[in-house]
């Protein structure tokens, strides 16, 4: 079959729309007709060269849609089911899935290669194999993916909104609730309140934090964060640190969450300094893997028992937490509709990312 997709051929170039050949589902695979795709900053790391994938690759790793066809042996979904895609597949049988760390599933090893777990590809054109970002390629009308990459959701939920819980919402919310282990009465500092960080605000608020202090240079994002539950907002880290010192009587924050678009050593150092004894720094944002971004005093960590840790997918369980977050939304306890700043069609994908670069969007969504 044929499908239109937004393809990246090399770093530094825009996405190109083209028609590709798409294989139908094999054993354990499903054909998804995508309804919506989120414009996440992680795809910008491909275009900027920070995360070098195998080119060419169909972009997009935040998606929702309807199952059109299933291959042999598929048990998780059936044709007609509404699904949200998880950018980390979860097999349920590897060491990490079996010990409750489904976000680290071994099937995620090829997410930048864009191939299926057996090394084969489902997108092709004129003899060339095209990868799919995170084995999903949601910047396409249709895709064939593993059944382990989709999560069935209630069919009365709007897929254009549900798409957000495939990456940005759990990554941010879980950074606060799971990785940050925030509790009632805590003080949290959040660096970067875009598509991920704004959901860390929601997570910290849901956890019962007394103070949620955000840092972002973009005024629009700071204003939005205050509407989502932040108690204080600052354009720079130094001003935020001074306020935290005042609010906590010099004790420091309980957790500092780093969700900026590109992590550097400056923000990591600021986060490590703003937490108090026994505090935790969680790094969820990405950077060029070849660059060292953690330069802190080991003595400070030892004497004050501070922790610096990373978090992938908000340390969530995709099969459980995607459904849980949508139920919170359905109950009016999680804001999703308010996250969508602008909707685009597939032809506008590059404009959507330019708007993201310009700080105009909390979250842009492509509606297929």
Swiss-Prot record:
One of its GO terms (biological process) is biological process involved in interaction with host. Keywords: Metal-binding, NAD, Oxidoreductase, Zinc. The keyword NAD applies. Zn(2+) 2 binds at residues 91, 94, 97, 105. Binds 2 Zn(2+) ions per subunit. SUPFAM superfamilies: GroES-like (SSF50129), NAD(P)-binding Rossmann-fold domains (SSF51735). The keyword Phosphoprotein does not apply. It holds the Pfam family ADH_zinc_N. Disruption phenotype: Inactivation of the mymA operon causes altered cell wall structure, reduced contents and altered composition of mycolic acids along with the accumulation of saturated C24 and C26 fatty acids, and enhanced susceptibility to antibiotics, detergents and acidic pH. Also impairs ability to survive in macrophages. Its cofactor is Zn(2+). Belongs to the zinc-containing alcohol dehydrogenase family. PANTHER family: ALCOHOL DEHYDROGENASE, ALCOHOL DEHYDROGENASE CLASS-3. This is Putative alcohol dehydrogenase D. It comes from Mycobacterium tuberculosis (strain ATCC 25618 / H37Rv).
């Amino acid at each position: 079959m044929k499908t239109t997709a937004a393809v990246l051929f090399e770093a530094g170039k825009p996405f190109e729309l083209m028609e590709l050949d798409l294989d139908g589902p094999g054993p354990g695979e499903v054909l998804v007709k995508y309804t919506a795709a989120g414009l996440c900053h992680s795809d910008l790391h491909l275009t900027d060269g920070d995360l070098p994938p195998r080119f060419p690759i169909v972009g997009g790793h935040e998606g929702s849609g309807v199952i059109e066809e299933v291959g042999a042996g598929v048990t998780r979904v059936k044709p007609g089911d509404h699904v949200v895609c998880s950018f980390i597949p979860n097999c349920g049988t590897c060491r990490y899935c079996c010990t409750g760390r489904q976000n680290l599933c071994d099937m995620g090893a090829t997410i930048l290669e864009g191939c299926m777990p057996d090394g084969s590809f489902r997108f092709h054109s004129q003899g060339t194999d095209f990868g799919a970002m995170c084995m999903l390629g949601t910047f396409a009308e249709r895709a064939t993916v593993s059944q382990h990459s989709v999560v069935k959701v209630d069919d009365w939920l709007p897929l254009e909104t549900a798409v957000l819980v495939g990456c940005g919402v759990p990554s941010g919310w879980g950074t606060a609730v799971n990785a940050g282990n925030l509790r009632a009465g805590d003080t949290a500092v959040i660096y970067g309140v875009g598509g991920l960080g704004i959901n860390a605000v929601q997570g910290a608020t849901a956890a019962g934090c007394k103070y949620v202090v955000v840092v972002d240079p973009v005024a629009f994002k700071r204003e939005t964060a205050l509407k989502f539950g932040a108690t204080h907002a600052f354009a720079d880290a130094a001003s935020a640190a001074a306020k935290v010192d005042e609010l906590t009587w010099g004790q420091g924050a309980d957790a500092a969450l780093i969700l900026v678009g590109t992590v550097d050593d400056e923000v990591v150092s600021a986060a490590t300094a703003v937490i108090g004894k026994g505090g935790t720094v969680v790094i969820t944002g990405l950077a060029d893997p070849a660059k060292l971004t953690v330069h802190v005093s080991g003595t400070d960590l030892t004497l004050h028992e501070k922790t610096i840790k990373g978090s992938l997918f908000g340390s969530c369980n995709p099969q459980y937490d995607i459904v849980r977050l949508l139920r919170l939304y359905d109950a009016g306890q999680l804001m999703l509709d308010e996250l969508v700043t602008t909707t685009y069609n597939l032809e506008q994908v590059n404009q959507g990312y330019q708007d993201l670069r310009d700080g105009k969007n909390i979250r842009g969504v492509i509606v297929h």
